[in-house]
Amino acid sequence: KLFILDKNKKNLQIKALNGEKDFPVLSIFRRFSSPVIWESDLSIDDYLFLFLNDNDCFSRWDSGQILMREIIKNNINKHVNYSLEYSFINAIKETIKSLDINDSFLLSTLLTIPGLAELETLFEKVDPINIYKESLNFQVLIGNKIHQELKVLSENILVNINQEWPMGRGERKLLGTIWSFLALAGDEGIKKDCVEAIVSSSMTIARS
């Protein structure tokens, strides 16, 4: 059962569907575009399921943000959840495989790491330096664990990277995200590509 607090602070109850053997994984705030603070009893497995399978872009993004915040928070608290890290990395691999360059903007959004301000809200006593360090460490982890997938994806993107704006926006956004992961993971070739893009005569690529 799902309980929602209405404007009069009364609990509204929505019953589970009859005939279902298993309790459904709820996808809410669909097509939502604003931040919202809410609580639920969805499990980590539920969020992994939504991240991989939901057909609503906002819900998939939100599930991914929750999972990444949980991973980074655990690392900051010195309670590394290796099982969650492994599951999420595999979920990213599956997402790359399913979306590839067919929806570059969505894939880039799903791979976006939570901002430092969001991570700071998870703690009563904030340590900005440690939060920043663990956020970078998590990005290095992603860059190392899915290095090959990211390299192949970046090569596929480069085919259409020079399309005249607004075409190619998603590809350029995704390429920037991929290069960030790979550069942080120490890929010297990608670092060189980043420098060349910055000094390139193509303003479209440089600004991306």
Locate each region found by the language model:
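Exposed aromatic-hydrophobic patches
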Residues: 2-18
